[in-house]
């Protein structure tokens, strides 16, 4: 038996008190523990990347909690055709962040995996994580949370089985990629259309004329997929973007960064990235894409190892924004017109929290949260994983979860409301100066700086105190 935490081959892991259960050995539930004079109870909503991190953090502290997952699986959007309705994986999907930058700090991915594993290995990684830490039997599957509301000094949570339960703390980890955003255009398109959320396989494009709207990661992936068997592929964008390669200088590009970036002034960091990307790929406007109207890292970059070649080969034709649809014709703002059979909207998502209606409703995807987790005026409510970063958010969710676990047990204090509001105000001003104004950039955090911030919030002495792990 090999432990993923340290790869030792003994039954009892030398770096962890946990071990893999045998197929016939049930995992023993952790005992309940009282903190102070009453039981501290919690509820976790969702069993995707952020939910799994949250559940592990609570279980590690012997906190008594319930855990609800709408579907039948752990892993959230990485489970293709997940029956919770939140799946966004497709058959060609691979990680856009490298394996070491994507894994949870407490549970490394196997070293013999590829630099950028496919979706099904990532899904298996979450399954293995849940089993390794004895989390699966804690989850109530196929049970949706329908309502969460504050009542006095606690929270009432109503689930799809008709029960209402009380908790001191609610950890919301349902993700922010479940409610597709589809823009409105003048006219009417009479062909087939769907959101990238519903895309699974390139067979749908065979022999068709395809228009993909949006140049985020999914948009570029889908356009490149379509180029393999479609009659024609057009990729429409309102503005230029910086395209980040997966490799530069012989390494996965995100491995060229280091924890030291948390201590480097942002302009210096930007110059370093610009030099690397320009050497690796050149400028977007020199590779057939529109010139970006912002500097590198001034917006969420798009990662693609294939698009530039597809454009250079003529397999994907870049187009500007759409003016209007008319039947099977699409007119672009530059006056050109193309006939298409399929339109794919790779146009992002709206944050959806229907169970918090009337309690907490994000406007234009804005969520003013202390450390991107805590709403100052709603004590006991935590939002896990509602972040975006240049890199993977998965490891960041574990840093969030460990901090929240410390808050619940009282190991670290919760700042005052005024302190939290001041932090939020400063953070929002900093992000407004750095990023273009759009609904996509309301959750941005800097990968290394955010880890440093979360470790300091736990009193762990900053990022460089112990980079690989959490404790």
Give names to the regions the model predicted:
Residues 258:
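Basic, ligand-binding patches in group-transfer machinery
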Residues 6, 14, 35, 39-92, ...:
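Flavin (primarily FAD) cofactor-binding/catalytic cores of flavoenzymes
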Residues 94-97:
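Flexible "cap/lid" subdomain of the alpha/beta-hydrolase fold that forms the substrate-access gate
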Residues 1-2, 10, 27-28:
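Short hydrophobic transmembrane-like helices used for membrane targeting/insertion
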Residues 26-38:
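Short, Lys/Arg-enriched N-terminal segments with co-localized hydrophobic residues
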Residues 424-430:
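C-terminal structured "cap/appendage" subdomains that terminate the fold
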């Amino acid at each position: 038996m090999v432990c993923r935490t340290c790869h030792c081959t003994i039954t009892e892991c030398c770096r962890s008190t946990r071990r893999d259960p045998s197929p016939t050995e049930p995992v023993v539930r952790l005992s309940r523990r009282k903190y102070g004079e009453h039981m501290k109870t919690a509820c976790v909503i969702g069993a995707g990347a952020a939910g799994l991190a949250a559940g592990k953090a609570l279980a590690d502290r012997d906190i008594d909690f319930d855990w609800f997952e709408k579907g039948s699986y752990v892993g959230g959007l990485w489970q293709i055709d997940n029956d919770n309705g939140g799946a966004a994986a497709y058959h060609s999907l691979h990680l856009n962040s490298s394996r070491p930058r994507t894994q949870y700090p407490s549970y490394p991915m196997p070293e013999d995996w590829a630099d950028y594993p496919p979706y099904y290995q990532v899904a298996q990684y979450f399954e293995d994580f849940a089993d390794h830490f004895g989390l699966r039997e804690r989850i109530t599957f196929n049970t949706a949370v329908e309502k969460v509301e504050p009542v006095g000094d606690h929270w009432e949570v109503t689930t799809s089985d008709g029960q209402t339960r009380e908790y001191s703390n609610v950890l919301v980890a349902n993700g922010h990629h479940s409610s597709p955003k589809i823009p409105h255009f003048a006219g009417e398109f009479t062909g087939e259309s769907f959101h990238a959320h519903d895309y699974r396989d390139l067979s749908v494009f065979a022999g068709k004329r395809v228009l993909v709207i949006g140049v985020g990661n999914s948009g570029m992936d889908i356009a490149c997929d379509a180029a393999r068997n479609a009659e024609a592929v057009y990729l429409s964008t309102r503005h230029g973007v910086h395209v980040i390669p997966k490799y530069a200088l012989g390494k996965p590009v995100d491995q060229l960064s280091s924890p030291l970036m948390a201590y480097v002034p942002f302009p210096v960091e930007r110059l370093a990235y610009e030099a690397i990307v320009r050497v690796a790929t050149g400028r977007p406007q020199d590779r057939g894409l529109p010139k970006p109207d912002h500097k590198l890292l001034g917006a969420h970059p798009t990662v693609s190892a294939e698009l530039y070649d597809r454009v250079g080969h003529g397999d994907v034709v870049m187009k500007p924004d759409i003016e209007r649809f008319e039947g099977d014709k699409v007119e672009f703002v530059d006056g050109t017109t193309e006939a298409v059979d399929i339109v794919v909207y790779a146009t992002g998502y709206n944050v959806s929290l229907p169970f918090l209606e009337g309690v907490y409703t994000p406007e234009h995807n804005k969520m003013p949260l202390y450390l991107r987790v805590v709403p100052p005026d709603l004590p006991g409510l935590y939002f896990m994983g509602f972040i975006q970063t240049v890199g993977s958010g998965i490891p960041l969710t574990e840093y969030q979860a460990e901090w929240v676990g410390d808050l619940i047990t009282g190991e670290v204090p919760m700042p005052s409301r005024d302190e939290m509001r001041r932090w939020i105000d400063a953070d929002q001003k900093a992000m407004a100066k750095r990023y273009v104004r759009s609904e996509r950039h309301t959750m941005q955090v800097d990968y290394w700086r955010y880890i440093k911030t979360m470790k300091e919030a736990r009193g762990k002495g900053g990022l460089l105190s112990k980079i690989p792990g959490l404790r």
